[in-house]
Amino acid sequence: MSESRITYKDAGVDIDAGNTFVKMIKPLVKATSRPEVIADIGGFGGLFSLNSSKYKNPVLVSGTDGVGTKLKIAFLANRHDTIGIDLVAMCVNDIIVQGAEPLFFLDYLATAKLDPEKGASIIKGVSEGCIQAGCALIGGETAEMPGFYSGDEYDMAGFAVGVVDRDKIIDGSSITVGNRLIGIASSGLHSNGYSLARKIIFDKMGLGIDDIIPGLDKTVADELLTPTRIYVRSILNLLRDFPINGIAHITGGGLLENIPRILPNGCKALVHKNSWQPPPIYQILQNAGNIEENELFRTFNCGIGMVLAVPEKEADEVLIRLSGLNEHAFVIGEIAKCEAGSECVEMI
């Protein structure tokens, strides 16, 4: 009696499903293409021809990120078509703050069992994010890992590469005392603080994924799955006409941890807490979770997705331009002299 043969599919990896998935996402990938893209997806590497004639001394800027436990909300709601926007946003927003135009993007998707339909829904979001950012999706990796992830769960990571002329790199070194801090509004929680938000909403408040959040006209799923705002086009527009001395992407660590990343020695940020109105979700989370104010500002973006440091004389014109770009923006503070031993960011 001969032993029965075993296949890769028997072990939980379906190559045919993978091939079906690739065919399904090709139009989504094509929709993001730029003239510099040389080859279609499916090769061993993505090819992108940098037009160096556009730059005096081009510097490539790279970033990688994920979306954290916001994925848990997507699993509970069984909604997967916007989480890819978050993935792109977290990466391209990190490189635009250095003045770099995002050029191309790659994604990594790992799951226990590949569902081509669900996978295509995820990549639909990645494609939309790339279109918003103006960068090309030139490749990715889909890993089917049976026994590694539970049930229908998956994880994602993204990788973005951009370019900036060396003399136009924004690193905060030109920030000076008197610069104004302009905050650009976020679209919600973006992709940070979800472990705390989930604990409060599900454990403390006892809500379900489809329940209306008290005080809001939105369900938990609608509020928490609001896509992260992509600021690339607006900031590139500003950089063409205004001197921007520093930009901070307000992600994990909130205002208190991210603004210091761009401050030169001898400078501190004075942030006026009453200069903008955070969306109601933050007050709801603070009250329900009994969160101290300092913890709130170092966990969530509190309604501010980007902070720009600009010369005082340019602040009003920058606000006008941002309004014309459909961004809600506010002067939220200024740069002051930092005395030895004092905090880099003061919330006043």
Curated annotation (Swiss-Prot):
Protein location: Cytoplasm
Lineage: Bacteria, Pseudomonadati, Thermodesulfobacteriota, Desulfuromonadia, Geobacterales
Gene name in the database record: purM
Protein name: Phosphoribosylformylglycinamidine cyclo-ligase
An example molecular function term from Gene Ontology annotations: phosphoribosylformylglycinamidine cyclo-ligase activity
Cellular component terms (Gene Ontology): cytosol
Keyword annotations from UniProtKB, A to Z: ATP-binding, Cytoplasm, Ligase, Nucleotide-binding, Purine biosynthesis
EC id: 6.3.3.1
Pfam families named among the record's database cross-references: AIRS (PF00586), AIRS_C (PF02769)
Catalytic reaction(s) noted: 2-formamido-N(1)-(5-O-phospho-beta-D-ribosyl)acetamidine + ATP = 5-amino-1-(5-phospho-beta-D-ribosyl)imidazole + ADP + phosphate + H(+)
Keyword Transmembrane helix carried by entry: no
Pathway named in the protein's UniProt entry: Purine metabolism; IMP biosynthesis via de novo pathway; 5-amino-1-(5-phospho-D-ribosyl)imidazole from N(2)-formyl-N(1)-(5-phospho-D-ribosyl)glycinamide: step 2/2
GO biological process, one term: 'de novo' IMP biosynthetic process
Classification via CDD domains: PurM (cd02196)
Xref: PANTHER family: TRIFUNCTIONAL PURINE BIOSYNTHETIC PROTEIN ADENOSINE-3, TRIFUNCTIONAL PURINE BIOSYNTHETIC PROTEIN ADENOSINE-3-RELATED
Main location: cytoplasm
